[in-house]
């Protein structure tokens, strides 16, 4: 694997790549690129997919600013995040998990630690709203490079318009059938401070250093992540059109 920014969780053994002419199916909108021989990988950062993905997030945020849509999002958020000063708005349930009580206690302890890193009790409303509007919620996992066993030191939010998950595959042509067989693949996150629309190579980040929670909804082509606000685009546009038309109508009929 190439050198990426961020830490890597060492695993006992990597799962071998089984010969196939199609990459694995991902449910997180991962973009697939093919390595270009000795010249490395080529990624069209000005392509339609990257541009549309960023524009789509900006469109969701624009729709969320509509007063009627904003009120609906607030109602959904308030119904989803329920809590008081004495209890946390979220908890992990391990009743049906067939593991020892000691491991369950460890999981609960680490879960509470993550909530403290996110300051979830204070910012649960904002965290849920970001995820609901954008359709994705990325965080950079920051650890102490000199003492990785100390665990996570900080979870830092990343603007999803600047981050994209990429799968880089290397193909080899089968001499018998002529099919292009995937023999190697690398996954990483590509970060660009100026967004995907900017030209140039971005920063490659190891996937273990990024937490990426998505809505789980994909477009019909299963290439882009959709927000729960996607179905609200048309109604909001129609509402704005009616409001603009009403203003023009009143101005036109004012002399009467």
Question: Where does each model-flagged region fall?
Answer:
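Structured, contiguous alpha/beta core segments that scaffold functional sites
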Residues: 1-79, 83, 105-106, 113-114, ...
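Low-complexity, highly charged intrinsically disordered N-terminal segments
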Residues: 85-97
